[in-house]
């Protein structure tokens, strides 16, 4: 996560977001993740940019809960020359989770199909923030949020009942896909969509 921006408006599917850092060398058509949801820049100025978002995407992500004036987590697409400081994040929302306990020990409830991809000390993305799983639970997970992360992202303001965008580690999905050929038919449980498909209004 690079910058904590702010939603200025949402009108007829057009988001306008105030920001500065993520606009460095930006160009029309480039991608910026908004709370973990990858969107395309369609217009920008010195301290703002705009993206179009469909009603389906809004309804299937935590963007449905964001209102003008709210803070939002922003991050540009990584380049080959950038340091990879966390795990690989694609900006493809796998599911929406619900906050059960706030920071510092953030607990999130997730759809049952997602729990198989969560492991202790594994990686998960919450509203675009790359985090390490502390406990993998039957119905979700917990992550430890340090004061710095709470202060420079939206996670510090999350309260029980709030919705968050979730993206699991893509490597887990690829491993599951590769191993499927070696699993006896009927044993594997349904999982989330395979990488590169569209599910729940978001590219996975």
Listing of model-derived features with the role each one plays in the protein:
Residues 1-204:
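Conserved loop->alpha-helix
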């Amino acid at each position: 996560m690079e910058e904590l921006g702010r939603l200025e408006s949402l009108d007829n599917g057009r988001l306008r977001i105030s920001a500065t850092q993520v606009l460095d060398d930006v160009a029309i058509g480039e991608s910026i993740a908004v709370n973990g949801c990858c969107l395309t820049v369609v217009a920008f100025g010195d301290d703002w940019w705009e993206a179009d978002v469909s009603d389906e995407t809004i309804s299937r992500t935590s963007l449905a809960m964001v209102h003008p004036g709210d803070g939002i987590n922003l991050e540009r697409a990584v380049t080959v020359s950038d340091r990879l400081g966390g795990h690989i994040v694609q900006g493809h929302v796998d599911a929406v989770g619900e906050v059960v306990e706030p920071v510092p020990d953030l607990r999130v409830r997730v759809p049952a199909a997602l729990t198989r991809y969560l492991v202790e000390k594994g990686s998960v993305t919450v509203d675009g923030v790359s985090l390490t799983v502390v406990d993998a639970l039957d119905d979700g997970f917990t992550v430890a949020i340090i004061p710095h992360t709470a202060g420079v992202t939206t996670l510090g303001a999350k309260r029980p009942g709030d919705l968050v965008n979730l993206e699991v580690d893509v490597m887990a999905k690829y491993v599951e896909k590769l191993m499927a050929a070696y699993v006896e038919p009927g044993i594997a449980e349904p999982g989330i969509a395979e990488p590169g498909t569209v599910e729940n209004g978001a590219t996975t």
